[in-house]
């Protein structure tokens, strides 16, 4: 059974600072499209202070600053301690529409990490974490164990923290449940030492990615059932965090070139295509700042 938080307040964080909008591929994940309030997902991106300091200190947080960086062929290299996080939040009322088996809001508050914004309570359903521990970054995606279709398409793999290290996709049904993801003793020890709420035991590492593909050229894939499938382009079979973010770049005007920006719609996998990056400087795998107005 999913773990419960000792109290609701102990699993709360600061308010969400992005709007909640209807996802463009709701039907793929069985996500509701009508109701009160209007079903929506709030997707926010956060960066740790080390990454923030590097970006601001080098004037890389404005179009003018990026244009100046391009003019002097500045090589963007985030500090090794840089971390970026993407979290997807769903209003608790919508959670009950999406998964009626949750029964009531009180149960959601026990099973999910929650917060409130503008008098609306949200539950965290998915989490991307990227860390610059190597040149290509380390990419990991996490899902709440109750996410419908959590391991669909690519399966779920965690050789360190999951007692069941490999869960294959259910090819007989889509958006089914995959059960709990009980943690190994080493991971539970780390979580206990960090004084984490037990509610985090309900979140599962889906897999990680550190390179573009295998030695034989087969591209690696990594996608989240909510972030890529419901909010993104609707599929996981051609999703790759590292391949998509390799095209994060800017041209002479401080904005992504048309060819680089166009790759976002194609779910690129495998090694980057050099010609796409012609006339661009890479932004060390970070799209978010480049896409800001």
Go through each PLM region and give its residues.
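Conserved small-residue
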Residues: 1-243, 247-293
